[in-house]
Amino acid sequence: MELNSIKPAEGAKHAKRRVGRGIGSGLGKTAGRGHKGQKSRSGGYHKVGFEGGQMPLQRRLPKRGFKSHLLKFNAEVTLSTLEQLGLAEVDLAALKSAGVVGQLAKVVKVIKSGELTKAVKLNGIGATAGAKAAIEAAGGSLA
């Protein structure tokens, strides 16, 4: 067998039905669209989700919750991330330059996730109670 000799199975492919080409074809005149009505017109169809004037599902259901616009300014850093950085002093600028937090971040908080063995001094960065205890246990401090 060769790639240029591969062909589809017999009867697997058929020509597209040409509509609107005379009554002898069986699909002339109305071209399978029936008589009159919105769906028979060119360009005539309803928008997605339209239910014939009934209140559509996406408007029947209530809105729920909200998304805070302040999230992009807040960031969190784990203890394991601080461990990987290997810096003695960590501040917002150091985290941004290392690519740990986004450039828009204004507030950073350390959360207790992972282990910390190196002493790290945090400048202008908050920490949860558990993270603070872990940092101090490793010989670090918060300023």
From Swiss-Prot:
GO molecular function: rRNA binding; structural constituent of ribosome
Segments of this protein annotated with the region Disordered: 1-54
SUPFAM superfamilies found in the cross-reference section: Ribosomal proteins L15p and L18e (SSF52080)
Keywords: Ribonucleoprotein, Ribosomal protein, RNA-binding, rRNA-binding
A single GO BP: translation
Matching Pfam families: Ribosomal_L27A (PF00828)
Gly residues compositional bias, start-end: 21-31
GO cellular component entries: cytosolic large ribosomal subunit
Membership in a protein family: Belongs to the universal ribosomal protein uL15 family.
Subunit note: Part of the 50S ribosomal subunit.
Family matches, as NCBIfam families: rplO_bact
PANTHER family in the cross-refs: 50S RIBOSOMAL PROTEIN L15 (PTHR12934), LARGE RIBOSOMAL SUBUNIT PROTEIN UL15M (PTHR12934:SF11)
Stated role: Binds to the 23S rRNA.
Name of the protein in its database record: Large ribosomal subunit protein uL15
Gene name linked to the record: rplO
